[in-house]
Regions:
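A short beta-strand micro-motif
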Residues: 2-10
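Eukaryotic low-complexity, Ser/Thr/Pro- and acidic-rich intrinsically disordered regulatory regions
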Residues: 48-55, 59-62, 97, 199-201
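RNase H-like nuclease fold core
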Residues: 58-112, 124
Length: 201
């Protein structure tokens, strides 16, 4: 389900169908509107506040290490990369990025980078003594493989599930949060930029 928030138009508000949204902006010069997957995001848009900023702030107050992860891939360079933007409970930030060319994973393109982003985030968390981590990602397989919602058949998914099984006991809590890709979420944009820069090195 989508929620349509009209900030500037004939009628201001949140609508649950596209026809309702169209009626609220039809004939209005330069309307401002946007669709969202949750009502909370739509409400923040109308208020002019950052929804994901507020969500992350709640995570940090709850003691989570927050990790935004992303991956990239270059067919021409035959390599993939990952970027991780970490936000510590005390507000400090840490960035991780890297590039790999594992032949057995290349055919999965940027998915390999997404996977290694999570792996590196968990490794960093373990090495630095964090027991609670929330991982934000835009590829749904990262959470679904470990819950067996998706079957792990590919080499990258099998490796990922095996790694997960080995590191999970080191944590008290690991949460996953899918975010929409290419939606101007500032934290995710940092991870995306890190991955792309690593690929270019």
């Amino acid at each position: 389900m989508k929620y349509y928030a009209v900030k500037v138009g004939k009628k201001i508000g949140i609508f649950e169908t596209w026809p309702e949204c169209q009626a609220a902006i039809a004939g209005f010069k330069k309307p401002v509107f946007k669709s969202f997957l949750t009502k909370a995001e739509a409400e923040c848009f109308l208020k002019g506040t950052d929804y994901w900023q507020s969500v992350v702030e709640k995570d940090l107050k709850a003691g989570y290490l927050v990790a935004f992860t992303d991956g990239s891939f270059s067919k021409e360079l035959t390599k993939f990369s990952y970027g991780v933007h970490l936000i510590l409970p005390n507000g400090q930030k840490q960035n991780i990025s890297g590039c790999r060319a594992d032949r057995e994973f290349l055919k999965t393109a940027n998915v390999a980078g997404e996977v290694f982003g999570v792996i590196e985030a968990l490794k960093w968390a373990k090495e630095n003594g964090f027991k609670k981590i929330k991982i934000y990602h835009d590829y749904q397989g990262l959470a679904r493989w470990i819950t067996s919602e998706w079957s792990a058949y590919s080499k990258i998914s099998l490796m990922y599930v095996e790694f997960w099984a080995s590191i999970k006991p080191e944590f008290n809590e690991i949460k996953f949060q899918k975010v929409p890709s290419h939606s101007n979420i500032s934290f995710n944009d940092v991870a995306d930029k890190l991955a792309k820069e690593a690929l270019a090195k």
